[in-house]
């Protein structure tokens, strides 16, 4: 970054913001880069600001029982805040004085006051000086308040982040990541720009008092008629605001539903294409979009009328103020024009500035209270340890995940023993206690000496991970003692990759040791992987390391743990994603050799690991089932395998767990009869044993970020799913959400995301930060993609302005959505932005406007209609202006005031009635036309948004994976959330405002030109100057705004990344390091934002300066050239003031339109994406009776029409080459082999060798060359969907979308309930589905969170059975499966797919042993394709991977003697992420 010119700028340069000229010049000439941005002043650095606020907050905490964050903020920022407030007030006072001077100028042209004509020029000078003073006061005040708001935001950002790193795991278990991001984005953005409006709470009352005093002098008591009308108008607008809020609340749920499905579709687009569900997903989303748009139109109409009421209220304010006085006493034109000017200022103050100020204070205080509550939450406490100890000891340790459950448990047992009966509430509490109150660990005892290896094994949910958490201090023991040295290194079960290079991920802030680093790389088998990258270990990993395979991520995480020099190494199932051979090598070289002298605790279920361990600890349901050596285990516990993992016992154990899951489901979900679904409230209910529901409680927490995460229940049946209110003395919202219920009644307009009715309680555990840390990489990496940006407030006052400050107020919400990407370093930051900067020009092109206008053919006619109506309004206005300026002299005898040649004076009752009849008639006409002029435009523009959404959705669904792979999931989702929200809400009214303002300016200029042609000459260069200034500024401002919005990404990415790896951070003690990285990201964003604010102020000040010059010219031209007639002078000066304020507004509005049209450009970019080859067609044909066929009838010229294809499943692959992107490096090269019908083929290869890629190539999801034939039909001769329908797929990443069981199994609704139940029986799903209310109509949400991983795999298996596919592709189907589900899948494969061709990619040897042929892939090519006997006889990868015990199983006749030896101990199963979550780790 460059050194800022601000540091050496003079006072004048700072006052006029001239120091920003270099960046404006550069931005106009070329595209700005991060290196062009200026460094921030030291006073704005996150380090200094956070230290300052943290010091005051600590002082507040130490001095008071009830600390207040606002007191700490006051001590930091109050005096500067008040100084700029006083400047703002003085600037606003000049607005009240200007009409006085205008009235005096008009009065000087009174024929009876010719002696005052000489002072008109001095009055004109005074009027111009007022504008100059106002400019010099207003802009520094606004900028100063912006600056303070920015500093407050930075300080609180840092304070919240530091607190987040200190929160206890129990607190994190109750807070969702969406709530944390919302706390930062939604609430803190209120300070950034809204602070400039806060002072109007006290400025407006003073201003109204001053104005009413001045109007009283003119009109006396009738002045209060206009004020009364304004108050009524404000109340009317408040009513419209509430109506708009009601529609928005109703619409919120529909938007949530649409974005739930859309986000799930985007995350699983590969599965959608593999299943051929494009049409089904498109239909589901479009149906939701239709309902959403109905409510969108209603909200838009109400908002339109709200805005129109302000525009056309000016007529009636003046009318009601002047009419009573005119009818009683008559009135001169000077008072009319002066009153008009006063009323303009008064109207803005009452209906705009004051409501905005009240809203700002309400929002700001609410945000401060939320942050204050968050900052007082319980912190993580490190355990006491002794650095001199060399052993790890745990004595009688018991622990609960639920805070305070240790005491509650003892109390509950005591109460239960004292009395046999209890009331309903107590029995409810105790009945649910087994689920929530059971200790996760109880009476654990072990001791290991230095250098020993302790292997921890056990069934799912036994407490293995919790044991490690307790050693690290994340889980506080309720009783017992833990003893260790405190120097800990940790490897998480789910690989955590931070943004940065591979080297940075491994070193992790520890001092670099070349020898140690190379030793770790070799031991963790990373050398070969690193050598494949051009940048070696300096390659940047983004989006959670998605450029790496799961095995590579796991090895990097292990290398990080091993690289740190510690006394105790905690390894939590580090080998889960590794193939068998790699796992063996790493265990030997890394765990057994490299760390031989270190104390290690390894969570594992592999028999080979147990044999090598010095001590073994087996946990079962939180208790110690066995502790000792392996030989002792065989002697003392020969039944341990069957006890824990035997299928008979496991069936019972699994049934108990399923009951627990069901109990939890029933606790979280309750049935709500046939009551209508209300998306504006989330009800929390108690599900008691009696079946009665607890009292409903409204909770309208608005959390747009969570709506992107997993928004809310997708309700498609009369069932209403609700959370449960758990028994607790503490208020539920305090325990479950850091965003309290204080946001009820907020009106929120979605920006990047959408309105949400708050995090549903049923998913709070799934959405908690603790769950985020225990989420698998494949699922966890999608969380940060879905985080969204800030929403904006829509105050009860409509969106309109007349002054620069009010224009600014309107821009209050023009925030570009926060989009999270992965990078911290400045050089690499641009590589991780969601939106490609190079593809979107800095300024919207004319082609985009033209294309947007022609999307809907009626839009052009609507624009013509608006123009015609406007011309009629101008004609009507000219009638009034002509009459006011040319009122004929009245008969002296009928005069109220006896004057000769008294022009433009209303004298008699007859003439006054005549004038006001015309005025009212014209006003009514204008009101009627104005109200309905824009409705067709708003309606049509929403229709255009509907069309663009449909086209974009269709384009994304039909785009090839090679194109989608180059896009970030968050970027795609932003198009459907942020950009569609802009097209729906902001763009229609902004375009209407701009068109209306532009026409008003044109009309006013025309009127002035008719009255005084010389002024028209001055107007032309001013308009040209405005246009040139706008073009000059727009180039730079849009680029700075883009850089600013992209600069937000690292902030929120860093937050999410830190939370995902929080246990690792704490174990390594790297909190200060990550705080430094967070401050660096904050400073980068601050540099962009501060420069944007400065250049914006430069532009606004230049507009004001041009306006002042123009007004000076108009004033002196009108004073010097106008002869007799005060009417002409009054009209010219009044219109001149209104022209320039309106033109200034129009210029700003045009910038807004250009900024919003960038969303249209991005949508068009997605619409123009290439499509996959072959247009999708219906793959089934109905029978004669109209029922859909259960098999696919091929539509191909090479096959007879009556043939059913595929019939056998024979598959031939010839010279297949696959690439991820067109022109990229081949992932697979020259693959050729043939599979016979009904054959089972296993794919073998190291992690990352291309096994899953080959399965994707079969489905034509990649760029492929070569040929594949199925039953003699080439893939080039049929459509894409017909080809994919030939395959059944069980993918590695299970896809469960939000919808009913029926929809998930049969989205096209081809099968009857009987057929679905039959298949559910075959795959073992019936018992699972029947446990849920509604059975097949039960709505699954949050990726099917109530189902275990195994049940989700069974869902995929059921889909394949229903598809009647002849070729089945299985990609790691048994990964993380329990034995019961695994046996069901094996049985189903043998029965339902007995005559099908099966291609299996699997790490479990026992599953591979059932295959007849094996395809070995190495270095992107086929190395071997033989039967199992040949592979075992040769030296191959398969021979190395298979163990002697597996050979015994495969060929028992070769080793008959060994069959009689001691029974082999089966391997314990790995735990799964879903099951870990269900059992609280």
Curated annotation (Swiss-Prot):
In what residue span(s) does the ABC transporter domain sit?
423-646, 1211-1444
Q: Where do we find the motif PDZ-binding here?
A: 1479-1481
Q: Where do the TM regions start and end?
A: 78-98, 123-146, 196-216, 223-243, 299-319, 340-358, 859-879, 919-939, 991-1011, 1014-1034, 1096-1116, 1131-1151
Q: What class of enzyme is it?
A: isomerase
Which UniProt keywords are given for this protein, alphabetically ordered? ATP-binding, Cell membrane, Chloride, Chloride channel, Endoplasmic reticulum, Endosome, Glycoprotein, Ion channel, Ion transport, Isomerase, Isopeptide bond, Lipoprotein, Membrane, Nucleotide-binding, Nucleus, Palmitate, Phosphoprotein, Repeat, Transmembrane, Transmembrane helix, Transport, Ubl conjugation
Q: Does the keyword Lipoprotein apply?
A: yes
Q: Which SMART domains match?
A: AAA
Q: What are the binding positions for ATP 2 in this chain?
A: 1220, 1245-1252
Q: Where is this region: Disordered R region?
A: 654-831
Where do the record's glycosylation annotations fall on this chain? 894, 900
Show the segment(s) annotated as Interaction with GORASP2.
1387-1481
Q: Which InterPro entries match?
A: AAA+_ATPase, ABC1_TM_dom, ABC1_TM_sf, ABC_transporter-like_ATP-bd, ABC_transporter-like_CS, ABC_transporter_C-like, CFTR/ABCC7, CFTR1_ATP-bd_dom1
Q: In this UniProt entry, which residues form the Cytoplasmic topological domain(s)?
A: 1-77, 147-195, 244-298, 359-858, 940-990, 1035-1095, 1152-1481
Modification comment = N-glycosylated. Phosphorylated; cAMP treatment promotes phosphorylation and activates the channel. Dephosphorylation decreases the ATPase activity (in vitro). Phosphorylation at PKA sites activates the channel. Phosphorylation at PKC sites enhances the response to phosphorylation by PKA. Phosphorylated by AMPK; this inhibits channel activity.
Lipid-acceptor residues (S-palmitoyl cysteine): 524, 1396
* Residue numbers of Phosphoserine PTMs: 549, 660, 670, 686, 700, 712, 737, 753, 768, 790, 795, 813, 1445, 1457
GO function terms (MF aspect): ABC-type transporter activity; ATP binding; ATP hydrolysis activity; bicarbonate transmembrane transporter activity; chloride channel activity; chloride channel inhibitor activity; chloride transmembrane transporter activity; intracellularly ATP-gated chloride channel activity
Q: Which GO terms describe its biological process?
A: bicarbonate transport; cellular response to cAMP; cellular response to forskolin; chloride transmembrane transport; intracellular pH elevation; membrane hyperpolarization; multicellular organismal-level water homeostasis; response to endoplasmic reticulum stress
Topological domains (Extracellular): residue ranges? Answer: 99-122, 217-222, 320-339, 880-918, 1012-1013, 1117-1130
Q: Where in the cell is it found?
A: Apical cell membrane; Early endosome membrane; Cell membrane; Recycling endosome membrane
Recorded GO CC terms: apical plasma membrane; chloride channel complex; cytosol; early endosome; early endosome membrane; endoplasmic reticulum membrane; membrane; nucleus
| Chain ranges of the ABC transmembrane type-1 domain | 81-365, 859-1155
Family per UniProt? Belongs to the ABC transporter superfamily. ABCC family. CFTR transporter (TC 3.A.1.202) subfamily.
Q: Give the quaternary structure.
A: Monomer; does not require oligomerization for channel activity. May form oligomers in the membrane. Interacts with SLC26A3, SLC26A6 and NHERF1. Interacts with SHANK2. Interacts with MYO6. Interacts (via C-terminus) with GOPC (via PDZ domain); this promotes CFTR internalization and thereby decreases channel activity. Interacts with SLC4A7 through NHERF1. Found in a complex with MYO5B and RAB11A. Interacts with ANO1. Interacts with SLC26A8. Interacts with AHCYL1; the interaction increases CFTR activity. Interacts with CSE1L.
Record's protein name? Cystic fibrosis transmembrane conductance regulator
Which species expresses this protein natively?
Macaca nemestrina (Pig-tailed macaque)
User: What phylogenetic lineage does the species belong to?
Assistant: Eukaryota, Metazoa, Chordata, Craniata, Vertebrata
């Amino acid at each position: 970054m460059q050194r800022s010119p601000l540091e050496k700028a003079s006072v004048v340069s700072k006052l006029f913001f001239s120091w920003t000229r270099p960046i404006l010049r550069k931005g106009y000439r070329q595209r700005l880069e991060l290196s062009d941005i200026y460094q921030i002043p030291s006073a704005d650095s996150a380090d200094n600001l956070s230290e300052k606020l943290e010091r005051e907050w600590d002082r507040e905490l130490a001095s008071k029982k009830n600390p207040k964050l606002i007191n700490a903020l006051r001590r930091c920022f109050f005096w500067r805040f008040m100084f700029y407030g006083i400047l703002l007030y003085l600037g606003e006072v000049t607005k009240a004085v200007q009409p006085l001077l205008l009235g005096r100028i008009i009065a000087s042209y009174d024929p009876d006051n010719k002696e005052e004509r000489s002072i008109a020029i001095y009055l004109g000078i005074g009027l111009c000086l007022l504008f100059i003073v106002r400019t010099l006061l207003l802009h520094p005040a606004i900028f100063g308040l912006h600056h303070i708001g920015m500093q407050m935001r930075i300080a609180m950002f840092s304070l919240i982040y530091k607190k987040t790193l200190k929160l206890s795991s129990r607190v994190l278990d109750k807070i969702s990541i969406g709530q944390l991001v919302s706390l930062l984005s939604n609430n803190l953005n209120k300070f950034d720009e809204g602070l400039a409006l806060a002072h109007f709470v006290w400025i407006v009352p003073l201003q109204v008092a001053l104005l009413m005093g001045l109007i009283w002098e003119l009109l006396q008591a009738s002045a209060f008629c206009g004020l009364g009308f304004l108050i009524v108008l404000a109340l009317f607008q408040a009513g419209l605001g509430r109506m708009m809020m009601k529609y928005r609340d109703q619409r919120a749920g529909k938007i949530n539903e649409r974005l739930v499905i859309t986000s799930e579709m985007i995350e699983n687009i590969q599965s959608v294409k593999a299943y051929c569900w494009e049409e089904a997903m498109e239909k589901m989303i479009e149906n939701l979009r239709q309902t959403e748009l109905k409510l969108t139109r209603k909200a838009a109409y109400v908002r339109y009328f709200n805005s129109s009421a302000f525009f056309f209220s000016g007529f009636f304010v003046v009318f009601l103020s002047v009419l009573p006085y005119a009818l009683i006493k008559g009135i001169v034109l000077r008072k009319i024009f002066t009153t008009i000017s006063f009323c303009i200022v008064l109207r803005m103050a009452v209906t705009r500035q004051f409501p905005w100020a009240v809203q700002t204070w309400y929002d700001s205080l609410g945000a401060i209270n939320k942050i204050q509550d968050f900052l007082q939450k319980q912190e993580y406490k490190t355990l006491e340890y002794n650095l001199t100890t060399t052993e790890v000891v745990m004595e009688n340790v018991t622990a609960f995940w639920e805070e305070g459950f240790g005491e509650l448990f003892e109390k509950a047992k005591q109460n239960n023993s004292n009395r046999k009966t209890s009331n309903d509430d107590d029995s409810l509490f105790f009945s649910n206690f087994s689920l929530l109150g059971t200790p996760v660990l109880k009476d654990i005892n072990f001791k290991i000496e230095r250098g020993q290896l302790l292997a921890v094994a056990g069934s799912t949910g036994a407490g293995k991970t919790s044991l490690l958490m307790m050693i690290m201090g994340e889980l506080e023991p309720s009783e017992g003692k833990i003893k260790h040295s405190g120097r800990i290194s940790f490897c998480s079960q789910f690989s955590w990759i931070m943004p940065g290079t591979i080297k940075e991920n491994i070193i992790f802030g520890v001092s670099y040791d070349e020898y140690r680093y190379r030793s770790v790389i070799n031991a963790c088998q990373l050398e070969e992987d690193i050598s494949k990258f051009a940048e070696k270990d300096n390659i940047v990993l983004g989006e959670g390391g998605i450029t790496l395979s799961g095995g590579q991520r796991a090895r990097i995480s292990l290398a990080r743990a091993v690289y740190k020099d510690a006394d105790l190494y905690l390894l939590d199932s580090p080998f889960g994603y590794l193939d068998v051979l790699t796992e063996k090598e790493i265990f030997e070289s890394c765990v057994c050799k490299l760390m031989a002298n270190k104390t290690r605790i390894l969570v594992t279920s592999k028999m080979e690991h147990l044999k090598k361990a010095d001590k073994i600890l087996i946990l079962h349901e939180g208790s110690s089932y066995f502790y000792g050596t392996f030989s002792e285990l065989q002697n003392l516990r020969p039944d341990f395998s069957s006890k824990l993992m035997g299928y008979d016992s496991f069936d019972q154990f699994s049934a108990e767990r399923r009951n627990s899951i069901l109990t939890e489901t029933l606790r979280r979900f309750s049935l709500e009869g046939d009551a209508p679904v209300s998306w504006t409230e989330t009800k929390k209910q108690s599900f008691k044993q009696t079946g009665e529901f607890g009292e409903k409680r409204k909770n309208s927490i608005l959390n747009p970020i969570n709506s992107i995460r997993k928004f809310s229940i997708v309700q498609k049946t009369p069932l209403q799913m609700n959370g449960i209110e758990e028994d607790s003395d503490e208020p539920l919202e305090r325990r479950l959400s850091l965003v309290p219920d204080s946001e009820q009644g907020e009106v929120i307009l979605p920006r990047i995301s959408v309105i949400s009715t708050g995090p549903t309680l049923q998913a709070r555990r799934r959405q908690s930060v603790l769950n985020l840390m225990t989420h698998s990489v494949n699922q966890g990496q999608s969380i940060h993609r879905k985080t969204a940006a800030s929403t904006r407030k829509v105050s009860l006052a409509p969106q309109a302005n007349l002054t620069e400050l009010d224009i600014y107020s309107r821009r209050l919400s023009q925030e570009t959505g926060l989009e999270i990407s992965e990078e911290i370093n400045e050089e690499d930051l641009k590589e991780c932005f969601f939106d490609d900067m190079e593809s979107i020009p800095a300024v919207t092109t004319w082609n985009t406007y033209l294309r947007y206008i022609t999307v809907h053919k009626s839009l052009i006619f609507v624009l013509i209609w608006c123009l015609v109506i406007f011309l009629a309004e101008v004609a009507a206005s000219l009638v009034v202006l002509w009459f006011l300026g040319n009122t004929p002299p009245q008969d002296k005898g009928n005069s109220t005031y006896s004057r000769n040649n008294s022009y433009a004076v209303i004298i008699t009752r007859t003439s006054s009635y005549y004038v006001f009849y015309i005025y009212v008639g014209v006003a009514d006409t204008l009101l009627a036309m104005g109200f309905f002029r824009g409705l067709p435009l708003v309606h049509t523009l929403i229709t255009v948004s509907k069309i663009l959404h449909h086209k974009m959705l269709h384009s994304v669904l039909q785009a090839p994976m090679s194109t989608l792979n180059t896009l970030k999931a968050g970027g795609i989702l932003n198009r459907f959330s942020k950009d569609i929200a802009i097209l729906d809400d902001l763009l229609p009214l902004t375009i209407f405002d701009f068109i209306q303002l532009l026409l008003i300016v044109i009309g006013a200029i025309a009127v002035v030109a008719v009255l005084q042609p010389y002024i028209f000459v001055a107007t032309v260069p001013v308009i040209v100057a405005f246009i040139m200034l706008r073009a000059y500024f727009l180039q730079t401002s849009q680029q700075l705004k883009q850089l600013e919005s992209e600069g937000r990404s690292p902030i929120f990415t860093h937050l999410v990344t830190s939370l995902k790896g929080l246990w690792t951070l704490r174990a390594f003690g790297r909190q200060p390091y990550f705080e430094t990285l967070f401050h660096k990201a904050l400073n980068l964003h601050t540099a962009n934002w501060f420069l944007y604010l400065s250049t914006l102020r430069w532009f606004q000040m230049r507009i004001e300066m041009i306006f002042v010059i123009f007004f000076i010219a108009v004033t002196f031209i009108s004073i010097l050239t106008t002869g007799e007639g005060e009417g002409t002078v009054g009209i010219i000066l009044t219109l001149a003031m209104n022209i320039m304020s309106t033109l200034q507004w129009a210029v700003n509005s045009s910038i807004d339109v250009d900024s919003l049209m960038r969303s249209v450009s991005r949508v068009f970019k997605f619409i123009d994406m290439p499509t996959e080859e072959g247009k999708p067609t219906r793959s089934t044909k109905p029978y004669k009776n109209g029922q859909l066929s259960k098999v696919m009838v091929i539509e191909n010229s090479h096959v007879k029409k009556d043939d059913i294809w595929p019939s056998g499943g024979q598959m031939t692959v010839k010279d297949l080459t696959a690439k991820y992107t067109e022109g990229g490096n081949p992932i697979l090269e020259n693959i050729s082999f043939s599979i016979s019908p009904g054959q089972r083929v296993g794919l073998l290869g190291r992690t990352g060798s291309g096994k899953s890629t080959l399965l994707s190539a079969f489905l034509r999801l990649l760029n492929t060359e070569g040929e594949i034939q199925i039953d003699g039909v080439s893939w080039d001769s049929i459509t894409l969907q017909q080809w994919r329908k030939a395959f059944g797929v069980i993918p590695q990443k299970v896809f469960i979308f939000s919808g009913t069981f029926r929809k998930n199994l049969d989205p096209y609704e081809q099968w009857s309930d009987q057929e679905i139940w039959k298949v559910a029986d075959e795959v073992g799903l019936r018992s699972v589905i029947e446990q849920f209310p509604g059975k097949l109509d039960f709505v699954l949400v949050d990726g099917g969170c109530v189902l275990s991983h195994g049940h989700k795999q069974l869902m995929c298996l059921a889909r394949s059975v229903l598809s009647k596919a002849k070729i089945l592709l299985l990609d790691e189907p048994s990964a993380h499966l329990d034995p019961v589900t695994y046996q069901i899948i094996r049985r189903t494969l043998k029965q339902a797919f007995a005559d099908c061709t099966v291609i299996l990619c699997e790490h479990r040897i026992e599953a591979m042993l059932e295959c007849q042929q094996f395809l070995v892939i190495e270095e992107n090519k086929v190395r071997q394709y033989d039967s199992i006997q040949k592979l075992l006889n040769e030296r191959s990868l398969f021979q190395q991977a298979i163990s002697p015990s597996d050979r015994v199983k495969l060929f028992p006749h070769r080793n008959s003697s060994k069959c009689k030896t001691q029974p082999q101990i089966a391997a314990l199963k790995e735990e799964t992420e879903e099951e870990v979550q269900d059992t609280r780790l």
